[in-house]
Each structure stands twice: as C-alpha cells, then as structure tokens.
C-alpha cells in the first residue's frame, strides 16, 4: 500500500458552542476533530431495526446521529464485510442457506455467499414489538455500503429486491447505489471498528486503501476544509469534516497497526472490554490503559457502561481527562443511563463522565443532549415515522 495522504494542520472554525477547534499542531490536535457530546449510532441501531443492515444505517442517518458505527471483517475472497460476531449464526439464516456451516467463521464465506443471507428475519423473531415484515431479506452489508448511506444514498436493487452489482474478470466486485429519495440531509461520519483483526492480516491497510478508493480517507486526495463545521443549520455535517472517520479496536496489535498505517492523523479510540468487579478502581490497571492509549496515538478511550461497581467511575474518567484524553462510552439504551454518565463528573455537575455516547437509541440520545442545551436540535419525527418515511412499513 502506498500512503501518500498529507494531513495539513490549520486553525479550525468555532463550534456551535463557541469553542474553537484547534489545529493538528495545537493542544488536543486530532482529538478536536470530533464534536463534544457526539451521538454515535451503535451498529446503526440494534433496537429499531436489524443491526448493521441498510435499514439500521438509513434510520440512524435520518435520525441525526453524528456517527454511524460499524464492525468490519473480511470475506474469503477479500471483500470487507460488515458483521459483529465471529459467525453469522445469531443474526442471519446461515443454518438454512448453508447447513452445517453455522459455526464457520465469517472469513470462510465468499462475498456472493454472504449476499444470499437474510439478516433481517432473526431480528423480527427476537423483537416482536419492533418487527416489520419488510425487514425480512435485509442483506449483510459490505464496507462501502455504510459510507454511501452516510452520503445520502441507498443500495441500488433489481425489481426482485436483490442488489445490483457486477464482478469483473479479476474477481473484483463493483456495487451500485442510487440517491435515497428519503434522505433528509444529515451527513454523519463513520466509526470503524475492526473485529478480530489478528485473524485478518493486513486488515488495517485494506481499510485505509478502501477508504481512499471510495473517497472517505481524509489523508488522501482533497482534504476537508479546516473551516467545515460539524453542523450546517440543523443538519449533521460531520461526514464532510476532517473528523469524518474514527478507527477503533479492542486489539492492542490492531491499535499499533492503526498508528503505523494512519500515522496518528485520524481519530482513533482504544476499546477496553468488560472489567472484572472493581478492576478499574486499581490505579495500576487504569494507568496502564491510559499509557497504552497514548502510546498508540489514540486520543479516545472507549469503555462500556458496566454495572454498579464496574465501568467508568468518576475517578477513572478524571484520570483519562487529566491525561489529555477523552472517553466515549458504549452502549446506551435508556435515558437513566444517559443521566448517569452526563450528570456526574470529577466533582462538578457540569463535567460529564462521557464525552460522547455510543448508543442503541440514537433517537433518545439526540433528544437527551438537545434537552440539556448541548445540541442545537432534537429529532424531527418518532422512530416509527422515520422508518415509515424510509419505506419500512409494517
């Protein structure tokens, strides 16, 4: 891979709140390419639509997420595939389409095999209150799909509902998209999580190259203007800024690979998993996590909500912030959870524990921040109305 992108530091425009965005050479640097109190749509949504599907990402975009979050793996024929689990068993009909292969890893299937899977019916079965017949037949997505949806497009389909694509003599796939007639103008960024990258050698380089190919690598080609705002009026505009992507992983080798490939010039977050009880109360544990995040050039740490004695305490949040880092927390489902992480802080009610929320309920989180006057707009429609606008009727 040839990395020719230049990242030019420049003074950035004032935010809606009046706080200045600093240049790459100033205190905070790349960290300031993300808005404070960012709403990050976890897998699009896992509540209102089948996770990581076109329906989930279109809904998150139109609901006003600042970022849509995805999980990326790789098919047998080297196509980047959007899937969280190590297998297709939980979210698709793989047991029906490919009997005996339910426990096979994602990387053992070709892209064409993957495109035959139904990624919607399992959601309907598990979530009868949110089930919609039209979700049946939702596809497992490829990497490019999510970015085109973020641009206001949708997958182009044949009359039978199958997606339009071609495959050239070299085996390379070419996917087609069209303007989404239900697009409402929000332009979110994309939060990219590599899953089990140790099992996919060169995954970080492939992500870099694919981002460059589809016009989403902020280090290649035309660099977004320093003055480009996070919002334009009441429309999200993060997807057109220098903070248009964030890369993250739980893998420590993967984090070091991100540092090598992206050169600490894009947003990055070091994910930490579920702690044992009171583990994050141990200074040696939290100090080491913070030290590694800084070593790999990640200005963000991502941690989970945890239970009463786990997760992000005021003390841990204080240490992260004192080290010059920020923390985004996953994954919110209720207003009560949001209140816990927004209200308390390091001894001050005005200092939230979480700098951003990775949420399964973008609708709730957008309105939560709006009600607390840290976001200029709330949702315009109910989640059900948004789904109907997008063509996902009952």
Q: Where does each model-flagged region fall?
A:
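Bacterial N-terminal signal peptides
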Residues: 9-17
């Amino acid at each position: 891979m040839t990395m020719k992108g230049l990242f030019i530091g420049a003074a950035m425009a004032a935010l809606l709140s009046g706080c200045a965005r600093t240049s790459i050479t100033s205190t905070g640097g790349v960290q300031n390419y993300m808005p404070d109190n960012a709403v990050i749509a976890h897998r699009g949504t896992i509540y209102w639509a089948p996770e990581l599907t076109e329906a989930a990402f279109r809904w998150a975009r139109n609901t006003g997420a600042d970022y849509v979050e995805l999980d990326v793996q790789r098919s047998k024929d080297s196509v980047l595939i959007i899937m969280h689990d190590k297998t297709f068993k939980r979210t698709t009909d793989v047991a029906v389409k490919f009997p005996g292969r339910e426990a096979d890893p994602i990387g053992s299937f070709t892209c064409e095999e993957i495109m035959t899977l139904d990624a919607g019916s399992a959601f309907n079965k598990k979530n009868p209150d949110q089930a919609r017949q039209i979700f049946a037949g939702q596809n497992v997505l490829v990497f490019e799909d999510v970015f085109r949806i973020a641009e206001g497009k949708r997958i182009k389909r044949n009359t039978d509902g199958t997606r339009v694509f071609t495959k050239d003599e070299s085996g390379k796939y070419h996917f087609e998209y069209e303007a989404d007639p239900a697009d409402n103008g929000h332009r979110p960024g994309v939060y990219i999580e590599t899953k089990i990258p140790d099992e996919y050698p060169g995954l970080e380089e492939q992500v870099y190259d694919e981002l460059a190919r589809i016009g989403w690598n902020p280090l290649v080609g035309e660099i977004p203007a320093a003055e480009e705002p996070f919002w334009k009026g009441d429309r999200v505009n993060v997807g057109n800024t220098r903070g248009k992507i964030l890369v993250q992983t739980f893998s420590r080798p993967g984090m070091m690979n991100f540092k090598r490939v992206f050169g600490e010039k894009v947003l990055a977050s070091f994910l930490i998993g579920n702690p044992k009880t009171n583990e994050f109360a141990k200074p040696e544990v939290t100090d080491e996590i913070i030290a590694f995040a800084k070593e790999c050039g990640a200005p963000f740490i991502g941690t989970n909500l945890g239970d009463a004695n786990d997760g992000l305490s005021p003390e841990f949040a204080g240490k992260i912030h004192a080290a010059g880092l920020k923390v985004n927390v996953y994954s919110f489902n209720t207003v009560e959870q949001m209140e816990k992480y927004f209200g308390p802080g390091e001894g001050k009610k005005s200092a939230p524990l979480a700098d951003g929320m990775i949420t399964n309920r973008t609708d709730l989180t957008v309105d939560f921040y709006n009600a607390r006057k840290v976001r200029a707009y709330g949702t315009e429609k109910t989640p059900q109305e948004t789904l109907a606008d997008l063509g996902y009727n009952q």
